[in-house]
Regions:
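Negatively charged
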Residues: 1-308
């Protein structure tokens, strides 16, 4: 176990020898000591982090905005809430994050924008959980994330919730075939990106996925979501126009309330079949405030509309 005084001794002797913590708790103590001495803009590159596997909440709700650009994070597997609620907006573009499995809430509510170090070339191919990763970011993202390899990710819930992304932002080519959960992924976000070629074969939960995200204009006609189970408010108040979704299979879905609220549908869905477990009320609410010709409604709904 590292002696916390090692850093203090090195400072007094002006040694350039790096401190090498083995555990997250030791790393936290060193960071705390340095920030107390030199303030939140201090340089922490004197810390050798090559043995650290867990960086969860390392700078959560911190004023830190110093230099950690040279950190070796090659063994880190967990970066949950690492910068959540923090003021950090430094350069971490050259980090090797290839072994990280969890990035849940990593930049949630933070000041990070990627302006001073684009993280678009990060190797995130092993990350399985990106839940709330950029949710509620304080400032618009300045990085594109275009080159991210997301083929291992299963959870993208709240990922860009209430986030504004810059003009360079482009996730159109992301591999999302393993994503199972995308609830509120783009809820109330400001993102203009074409997701028409996304393959969502594994998607199970998509409640509020695009709710109030009214900057999207892409066509979902190519989408196929055979495993979709719940999609309440999925496109509610997004303003998306649906040109042709006749081929969508909704027969296994049990959550459809307000799915197309405030949208426009320009295709005939009369042959759609609902799950026998769905109540009439749920079926009917699927198209609440939706602009769709009466004859285009699913046949199972038409009698319900007439009753009302």
């Amino acid at each position: 176990m590292i002696n916390i005084n090692e850093y203090l001794i090195n400072k007094q002797t002006k040694s350039i020898h790096k401190v090498k913590p083995q555990l997250r708790a030791e790393l936290l103590e060193i960071i705390k000591t340095k920030i107390e001495e030199e303030g939140p803009n201090c340089n922490l590159n004197f810390i050798d982090t090559s043995d650290i596997e867990d960086m969860q909440s390392l700078f959560e709700n911190s004023e830190f905005n110093g230099d950690i650009s040279q950190w070796n994070v090659s063994k880190v597997r967990n970066m949950t809430d690492m910068f959540s609620g923090s003021k950090f907006n430094g350069d971490i573009s050259k980090w090797n994050v290839s072994n990280v499995k969890i990035m849940r809430g990593m930049f949630h509510r933070s000041a990070f924008t990627g302006k001073y170090g684009d993280i678009s070339n990060w190797n995130v191919s092993n990350v399985e959980n990106m839940d709330s990763m950029f949710a509620n970011c304080a400032f618009p993202l300045k990085c594109s994330l275009k080159n991210w390899e997301t083929s291992s990710c299963k959870n993208m819930r709240n990922m860009f919730r209430q986030t504004t992304c810059g003009s360079d932002f482009d996730i159109s080519g992301w591999d999302v075939k393993k994503v199972e959960t995308a609830n509120s992924m783009f809820f109330n976000s400001i993102i203009d990106c074409d997701l028409s070629n996304w393959k969502l074969d594994s998607l199970v939960e998509a409640d509020s996925m695009f709710e109030k995200a009214n900057s999207f204009t892409f066509d979902v006609s190519k989408w196929n979501m055979p495993n979709l189970f719940t999609a309440e408010n999925m496109f509610a108040d997004s303003g998306i126009t649906f040109k042709d979704i006749r081929h969508w299979d909704i027969s296994n879905m049990l959550g459809v309330r307000n799915m197309f609220k405030g949208c426009e549908i320009k295709c005939n869905l009369s042959k759609w079949k609902f799950s026998y477990k769905l109540s009439d009320r749920s079926k009917n609410s699927m198209f609440d405030q939706c602009r769709i010709p009466e004859y285009c409604l699913p046949n199972e709904i038409k009698p319900l509309r007439m009753e009302n």
